[in-house]
């Protein structure tokens, strides 16, 4: 499959450029720090004691400082949402780069794990060398109290050692709970362990306050490796002068040859004993800015979300899909954004993100979400919203006497689908419940499509059975009829694909005549679909938006980079629930 460099640069170029910059920063920081501790005169004596372990531990620490600061930035969701909607970021390419924030977070996390391993291994070697190479001449340098002290004591009786062990434990818990299997099977574990990040950062700030590694402060008056002489005031002395002053008898055997060889060599003389000082901690310089920004945002989000919403109605759709309609004072959101729901009656600490399927407008303040009942949290939430006797009913209208649980929302936050209205042509592909991000887009078009750039929308929905799309079919029919009445039949191209055929004719034939010709059995032929779109939109840029299984996502991503003979460029965007 031939690759279109134009599409590849649009989809991958900026991402790979940022990756290259990030990689260069890590390599440069590692190498510069390694050379400093390997060749720096102020680290001469500590390097003599610890060797390569010193260089590796400090170089890896510098990389950890960088990534521990960067990993917090993608988690500042309110800041990212502001930047996405701000006129200060007019470039669509720059806004699309914000969609890679999750990738940056994961990349920095993996890097932290790798270099934490290097850092720990290097310090284990350092602990051994501190014990074995105990210095009688420079007692200030020693971390051990005596020679051949058990290195394990350094790990469990010093602040850097003890905090380091605790950080390794916390990091291990966070990493193992972040695996895909645990996130899918038990999201609670992932959520609770990931909030240990605050403990990790507090330990990190304590970790660097121990001051075990020390550098020399008087390099000018005590050059590294100098010879300490009594009753001399000369800093530099040639070997013959040194010999004539200190050897009055016959020269040591073989010294004449040594004199000839080093005739011009200068021996550095110490004017005073070396002085050592612990490093001023630099980690806080790296992480204080991002950490303060993140904490300030969390405080702002806490204040913003402290007032519960008013639940207007709860709708129980087929296929275990629930719809929740709410109102909150001064709540504003853009199509494609998502919110985080928090129900204390379900879980005191747990929150879950849900894409808005209905956004508030100037004429109506109602907004809503759809969610599929899968997992412990959604099951408990459903049971609180619907009494057991009413869970089989289709619609529960708002009843004043109904005691809904208190529900808090945080957000809204940005997502890639905000850009779907900013293309002239958009291709939206959904798989199963992945259709929810597009619901708000279609509802917005139903209200008023004229303020937006979008003039043609291809909507593809792949479902397992007919019940999966029943709750969404009414909106599709209304939207289709709207554009037909406005004499714009080509504005929305709807294609629905089902893998099971049971009961299709009965349901479709009776209720959704409009969708008869747009319903297909089997899977889409993606290559033919892309060719058709490219042919109908020659020379244009098409936004491709996908929310669904990874198999569909990978196929669309590959086809978006494929070359076509019509000069059409496909820009790929993806949303993921995991």
From Swiss-Prot:
Any GO molecular function: superoxide-generating NADPH oxidase activity
Activity regulation description: Activated by insulin. Inhibited by diphenylene iodonium. Inhibited by plumbagin. Activated by phorbol 12-myristate 13-acetate (PMA).
Residues spanning the signal sequence: none
Segments crossing the lipid bilayer: 17-37, 63-83, 105-125, 155-175, 189-209, 425-445
Membrane topology of the entry: Multi-pass membrane protein
Name under which the protein is recorded: NADPH oxidase 4
Post-translational modification: N-glycosylation is required for the function.
Glycan-modified residues: 133, 230
Physiological role: NADPH oxidase that catalyzes predominantly the reduction of oxygen to H2O2. Can also catalyze to a smaller extent, the reduction of oxygen to superoxide. May function as an oxygen sensor regulating the KCNK3/TASK-1 potassium channel and HIF1A activity. May regulate insulin signaling cascade. May play a role in apoptosis, bone resorption and lipolysaccharide-mediated activation of NFKB. May produce superoxide in the nucleus and play a role in regulating gene expression upon cell stimulation.
Membrane topology (Extracellular): 38-62, 126-154, 210-424
Stretches in topological domain Cytoplasmic: 1-16, 84-104, 176-188, 446-578
């Amino acid at each position: 499959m031939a690759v279109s460099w134009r599409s590849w640069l649009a989809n991958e170029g900026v991402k790979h450029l940022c990756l290259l910059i990030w990689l260069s920063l890590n390599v440069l920081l590692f190498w510069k720090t390694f050379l400093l501790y390997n060749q720096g005169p102020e680290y001469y004596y500590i390097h003599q004691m610890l060797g390569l372990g010193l260089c590796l531990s400090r170089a890896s620490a510098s990389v950890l400082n960088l990534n521990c600061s960067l990993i917090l930035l993608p988690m500042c969701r309110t800041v990212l949402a502001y930047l996405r909607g701000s006129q200060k970021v007019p470039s669509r390419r720059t806004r699309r780069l914000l969609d890679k924030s999750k990738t940056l977070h994961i990349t920095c996390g993996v890097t932290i794990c790798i270099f934490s391993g290097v850092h720990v291994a290097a310090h284990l070697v350092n602990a051994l060398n501190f014990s074995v190479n105990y210095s009688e001449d420079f007692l200030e340098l020693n971390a051990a109290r005596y020679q051949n002290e058990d290195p394990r004591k350094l790990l469990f009786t010093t602040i850097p050692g003890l905090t380091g062990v605790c950080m390794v434990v916390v990091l291990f818990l966070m990493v193992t709970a972040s695996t895909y299997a645990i996130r899918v099977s038990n999201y609670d574990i992932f959520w609770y362990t990931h909030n240990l990040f605050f403990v990790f950062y507090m330990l990190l700030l304590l970790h660097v306050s121990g001051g075990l590694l020390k550098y020399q402060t008087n390099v000018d008056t005590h050059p590294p490796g100098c010879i300490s002489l009594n009753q001399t005031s000369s800093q530099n002395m040639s070997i013959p002068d040194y010999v004539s002053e200190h050897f009055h008898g016959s020269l040591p055997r073989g010294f004449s040859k040594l004199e000839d060889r080093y005739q011009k060599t200068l021996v550095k003389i110490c004017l005073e004993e070396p002085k050592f000082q612990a490093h001023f901690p630099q980690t806080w310089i790296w992480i204080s800015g991002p950490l303060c920004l993140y904490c300030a945002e969390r405080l702002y989000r806490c204040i913003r979300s402290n007032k519960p919403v008013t639940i207007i109605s709860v709708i129980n759709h087929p296929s275990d899909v629930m719809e929740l309609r709410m109102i909150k004072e001064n709540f504003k959101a853009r199509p494609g954004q998502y919110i985080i729901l928090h129900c204390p009656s379900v879980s005191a600490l747990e929150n879950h993100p849900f894409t808005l399927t209905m956004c508030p407008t100037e004429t109506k303040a109602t907004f809503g979400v759809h969610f599929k009942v899968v997992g412990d949290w959604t099951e408990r939430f459903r049971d609180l919203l619907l009494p057991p006797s009413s869970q089989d009913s289709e619609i529960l209208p708002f009843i004043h006497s109904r005691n809904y649980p208190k529900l808090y929302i945080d957000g809204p936050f940005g997502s890639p689908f905000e850009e779907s209205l900013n293309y002239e042509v958009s291709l939206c592909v959904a798989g199963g419940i992945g259709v929810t991000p597009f619901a708000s887009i279609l509802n917005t078009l139903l209200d008023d499509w004229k303020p937006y750039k979008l003039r043609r929308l291809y909507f593809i929905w792949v479902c397992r059975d007919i019940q999966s799309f029943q709750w969404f079919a009414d909106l599709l029919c209304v939207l289709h009829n709207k554009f037909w009445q406005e004499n714009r039949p080509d504005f929305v191209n709807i294609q629905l694909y089902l893998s099971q055929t049971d009961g299709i004719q009965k349901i479709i034939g009776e209720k959704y005549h409009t969708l008869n010709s747009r319903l297909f059995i089997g899977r889409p032929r993606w290559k033919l679909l892309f060719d058709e779109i490219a042919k109908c939109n020659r020379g244009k840029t098409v936004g491709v938006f996908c929310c669904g299984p990874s198999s569909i996502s990978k196929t669309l991503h590959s086809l978006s980079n494929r070359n076509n003979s019509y000069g059409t460029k496909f820009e790929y965007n993806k949303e993921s629930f995991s």
